[in-house]
Every structure is written in C-alpha cells, then in structure tokens.
C-alpha cells in the first residue's frame, strides 16, 4: 500500500479534509474561468459584445453535454477506483481507470461528429435568434475541435484527485486556465478574432491541461497507472462505471435541458435581452456551486477509501463536516447574489439594459441556492458510497421532476418572472427531499458496512 493513499484512512481528519478540499476548490474555481473568462471578455467586445455574449450563452448546453460525458466516465469510475485502493486492489483500480479513458476517447469522437454536423439547427433549438446565431456558430465550431482535450482533462483528472493527489489535480486545471486568461485578450482583441479567438484560446488551454493529466497518470508518480492494455473496454467494468456514472451524467446533462427550457421560454416571453441575462445567471451559478463541488470532490476519496476499508466512524465524521462546510459556502456566495447582485453582474456586461434586468432577477433566482450546499454534499456522499440508484433519483429530482415542469408552467400565470421563480422553488423542495433520503440511506449503509 502506497503511503499517499494510506493516509486517507489514518491522517487526522480535519487536516486531511482541508489539504484535499482546498486544492480541489482552487481547481474547480480555476476550471470555471475557462468559460466565464471567455464571457467576460466577449461581453466587452466593442460594438457587438451584448449580442456575442448572448450567442455564446446559447452554446452552454453543448458545453455542458460534453462535460457530462466526461463526468460519466470520470466521476463514475474514480470513486470505484478509490474503493479498490481502500481494498488494496491496485490492479482492479487501474482497470477501471483504463476503461474510463477508453470511454472518454469514444465519447469525444461521437460528440464532435454529431454537433459539428447538426450545430445550426441545434443552436436554434437552444434559443439562438437570427441576430445571435453567427456568434454561437463561430464559437462552437472551433470549440468542438478540442472535445477530446476537454474529455481527457476533466474526466481523467478525477483519478488524480481520487488517489489523494489534490495538489496535482489543481495544477492540471491551473496550467490551462492561466494560459486561457492570457490568450483570450490576445486572440479576441489584439488579433481581432472576436468570438472565434475566445474559442481558440480555450481549445489550446484545454490541450495543455489534457497533456499534463495524461502524463501524470502514465508516470510512476501515480498510484494507479494508465496503460493502453487497460483501455480495451470490458463489459463488466463499463457496467460498474455506468451504474455510478449515470448520476453525475444526469446532473450535468440535464443542465443542458434546463438551459434549453429556460432560454426558449425567455425568448418567447421576453426576447434576446432576457436570454442574455440568463447567460450571466448561469455563469454566476457556476461561480457559486463549483467551489462547493470542489469541496465535495476533494473530500470524496476519504469517504470512498474508508467505505472500502470498513471504517464507518471515519465515513460518518467526514460526511457531517462536509455538509456543514458546503452549506456555509452556498450561504455566503449566494448571499452576495441576493443582497449585492451588481457585484456579479458588472463582471459580464456594461450594457445598461442588461445590467438593470439581471440585477432585478438575480436575487429571486438565487434564493434557493443559498441552502444548496446540503444537496451537493448529500449527492457526493451517495456517489462516494456506491449508492447508484439513490444518487440517480436525487439527480433526476431537482431538474427533471421539479425545475423543468415549473419553468414551463409558471410563466403561463406569472409571465417571464415565472421562469426565474421556478429555480428557487425547485431548489428548496429538492434540498428538503434529499435531506430526508440521506438520513434514511446513510443509516442503512453504515449499519451494513
């Protein structure tokens, strides 16, 4: 047993959680910068920044779908690999890693081909108008070239975190994000490439991150090694990954469906300005929830490892602390959106109309997100413990069962504001339900551990 993963079961819990969560939070924050920095620069392009920002916002469902497939393979396999490390079965952990990598390559080919062929009708379906389609198409056409890099960088980085190497995982993201921040103004403004320049900067940055991740996993520094032999897909391994990966996949892919529903509703009841406001709201949503997800992803290996080792008291203590920290995080970050929305909104646009509208709807939209940390912590606990069915139900609850129907029904009675109010209603109901399911499920799992 390597001392780096052994400490997951023996190091002082508070210090261990901090050492793993902090780099993971930093990595997630940095990762958000890929798309958010693009939007910040794009929104300030002279002459057409407002239309360009709306157009790029329309591509969000495609970007989310690409990330969802990386989560399917990465987050579906990494907890399983961590559990195997806890059982001191390195060979099985490496087999899971290799099959995940094989899936990521396969997904990249399929996604690139599909969206390249059907991008125009898809973008119109996602809320693009004749005034914004050119910017949406310019951005996504180039972004799709780098799908393989996004898949590998995001999906395989979970295996670096899963073996307790949170700092290495953070560097994987940091390298690409810093490069993206530097290249964006160069390609957008200096080389006058506009929206296309933002996409080129993102692709190049993700490529560097992907190379870094793969290089680490094939090296002797990695507790579990990535090999070509293990990339040959095996039915039993894929079934295991799919069982656990379907939940994070649904969590992310349904974000695309949510965005489509919201954008089409806003286009119908409001127009381009309202779609533009949603682009900003989605970006701020990432700024609030991604750091919390970073906390849960950093702590996840502790739960999975100790679950595999049968250390129930350590599992219980870890989950309690994770819930408290996540709730505190969303209360603070969402509080800014509720009480001082101009702080977030001003980052993305200087258009007076868009500023006023977004500042008006942001406090309403983020009311429920203030307690969403509970949902994030519980969801990660289900995944970490291998509770695939429960995790799947929770993933479906908030978005498919609650949010999408509410976003369709409420504007019929409340007008365009009904779309914004659907989010907090769905969030509160989902958090309450998840909390009840968590208490029942965890008691049963710990009793049988």
Residues of each region from the PLM?
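Helix-terminus/linker motif at the lipid-water interface of multi-pass membrane proteins
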Residues: 29, 33-54, 123-130, 186-193, ...
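Small-residue-rich hydrophobic transmembrane alpha-helices
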Residues: 53-113, 150-169, 277-341, 372-391
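Short alpha-helical transmembrane segments in multi-pass integral membrane proteins
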Residues: 1-21, 81-148, 190-245, 303-368, ...
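N-terminal transmembrane alpha-helices
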Residues: 8-48, 61-76, 80, 84, ...
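Residue-level hotspots within the lipid-embedded alpha helices of multi-pass solute transporters
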Residues: 28-32, 68, 108, 112, ...
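Alpha-helical transmembrane segments and their lipid-water interface positions
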Residues: 27, 31, 35-42, 67-74, ...
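Short runs within selected transmembrane alpha-helices of multi-pass transporters and secretion channels
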Residues: 143-161, 169-177, 198-211, 293-297, ...
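Transmembrane helical elements of multi-pass membrane transporters/channels
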Residues: 19-38, 142, 176, 205-209, ...
């Amino acid at each position: 047993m390597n001392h780096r993963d052994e400490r997951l079961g023996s190091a002082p819990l508070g210090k261990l959680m901090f050492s793993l969560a902090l780099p993971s939070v930093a990595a997630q924050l940095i990762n958000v910068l890929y798309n958010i920095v693009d939007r910040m620069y794009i929104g300030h392009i002279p002459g057409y920044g407002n239309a360009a920002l709306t157009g790029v916002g329309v591509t969000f469902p495609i970007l989310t779908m690409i990330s969802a497939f990386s989560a399917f393979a990465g987050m579906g396999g990494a907890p399983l690999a961590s559990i195997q490390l806890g059982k001191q079965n390195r060979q099985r952990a490496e087999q899971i890693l290799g099959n995940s990598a094989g899936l990521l390559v396969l997904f990249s080919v399929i996604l690139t081909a599909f969206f390249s062929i059907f991008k125009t009708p898809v973008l119109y379906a996602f809320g693009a108008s004749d005034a914004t389609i050119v910017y949406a198409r310019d951005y996504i056409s180039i972004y799709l070239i780098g799908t393989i890099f996004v898949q590998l960088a995001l999906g395989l980085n979970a295996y670096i975190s899963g073996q307790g190497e949170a700092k290495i995982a953070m560097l994987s993201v940091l390298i690409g994000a810093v490069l993206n921040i530097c290249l964006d103004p160069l390609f957008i403004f200096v080389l006058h490439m506009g929206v296309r320049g933002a996409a080129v900067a993102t692709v190049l940055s993700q490529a560097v991150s992907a190379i870094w991740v793969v290089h680490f996993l094939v090296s002797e520094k990695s507790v579990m090694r990535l090999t070509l032999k293990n990339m040959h897909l095996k039915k039993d391994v894929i079934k295991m990954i799919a069982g656990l990966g379907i939940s994070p996949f649904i969590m992310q892919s349904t974000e695309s469906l949510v965005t489509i529903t919201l954008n089409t509703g806003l286009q119908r009841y409001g127009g381009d300005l309202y779609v533009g406001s949603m682009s900003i709201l989605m970006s701020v949503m990432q700024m609030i929830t991604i750091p919390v997800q970073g906390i849960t992803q950093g702590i996840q290996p502790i739960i999975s490892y100790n679950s595999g080792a049968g250390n129930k008291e350590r599992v219980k203590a870890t989950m309690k602390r994770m819930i408290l920290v996540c709730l505190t995080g969303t209360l603070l970050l969402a509080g800014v959106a509720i009480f001082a929305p101009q702080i977030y909104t001003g980052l993305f646009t200087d258009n007076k109309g868009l500023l006023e509208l977004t500042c008006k709807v942001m406090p309403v939209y983020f009311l429920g997100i203030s307690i969403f940390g509970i949902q994030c912590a519980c969801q990660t606990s289900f995944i970490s413990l291998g509770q695939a069915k429960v995790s799947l139900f929770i993933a479906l609850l908030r978005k498919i069962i609650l949010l999408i129907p509410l976003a369709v029904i409420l504007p019929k009675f409340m007008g365009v504001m009904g779309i914004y109010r659907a989010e907090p209603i769905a969030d509160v109901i989902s958090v309450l339900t998840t909390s009840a399911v968590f208490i029942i499920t965890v008691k049963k799992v710990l009793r049988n551990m």
